Regions:
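RNase H-like (RuvC/DEDD) metal-dependent nuclease/polynucleotide-processing core
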Residues: 4-54, 59-264
Length: 264
């Protein structure tokens, strides 16, 4: 399980909170200073693994349906687009420029993406109004409790949108590298050796990491353990918005045809 982050600089040499952490069930969590180091570590782990591998990432694998329609892409097209546009280096990335370009392509206005230290004509610092009838959350996100932040917010307290912009290109590179060995759930049937899935650590009881000096570390530790019993990948209908994989006994809600669970 992976706790992703959108730092624009390498994390400190000494492990800390608000950084990149990942964990295999039964092992101690690992700390990485950059996304590039983590990507390399994931590749080594996959290549060295015996049997099947489930990789869970805590960022959105897609956007609300209307955004995909406006961009003229399905989930594969979105992943390819972001991989082509995003430049991510240890001390710099262009995520705000890419978000502004996505706004131009999707609406021609400074929406839906927002949140930046330096506002521009196509990327505002504050939350904009969305076009009429356009939703802020995917169905799988709206069903969760606690409800997650919007993937459109890139900057500010609790923002998660930058993680998606910088994370999806890593997933796409894994997808291209491992080819027919790898599938992306729930867009593809989870029948291959390597399965990528979106997870939501905040569904776990906060008491598991409350008061811990590095809560990120504890989140991946407990999330990896939560899927120890296996996964029931069965879903009803899933489109290009995707779905979320939760541990057994997660939150209940009205739109759970886009959510699957681990086994108790």
């Amino acid at each position: 399980m992976v706790d992703w982050i959108a730092r624009s600089r390498p994390a400190p040499a000494r492990s800390c909170r608000d950084a990149l952490w990942w964990c295999r069930d039964g092992e101690a969590p690992r700390y990485e200073r950059t996304r590039q180091e983590l990507e390399a570590g994931l590749i080594r782990t996959i290549e060295g693994a015996r049997g099947r591998v489930l990789l869970g990432f805590d960022f959105s694998f897609s956007y609300p349906r209307w955004v995909l329609d406006a961009l003229g892409v399905d989930w594969r097209g979105l992943w390819s687009l972001l991989t082509e546009e995003i430049v991510d280096m240890p001390e710099w990335n262009n995520r705000f420029d890419v978000a502004a370009e996505l706004n131009r392509r999707a609406t021609g206005e400074p929406a839906p993406f927002w949140g930046t230290p330096r506002a521009s004509a196509l990327l505002p610092a504050r939350k904009p109004l969305l076009p009429a009838g356009c939703l802020e959350l995917r169905a799988c996100e709206a069903a969760l409790r606690p409800r997650p932040k919007s993937g459109f917010q890139l900057w500010g307290a609790g923002s998660v949108g930058s993680q998606t912009l910088l994370g999806i290109p890593v997933l796409e590179r894994l997808r291209r590298r491992f080819g027919v060995e790898l599938c992306v759930w729930p867009f593809e049937a989870p029948e291959r050796r390597i399965v990528l899935a979106e997870v939501y650590p905040s569904c776990l009881p906060k008491a598991l990491w409350s008061g811990h000096p590095v809560p990120d570390r504890e989140q991946v530790l407990h999330l990896a353990a939560a899927f120890r019993g296996g996964v029931d990948f069965a879903l009803q209908q899933v489109g290009d918005e995707g779905g979320i994989l939760l541990p057994a006994g997660g939150p209940e809600g009205p739109a759970l045809d886009c959510i699957a669970r681990g086994k108790a």
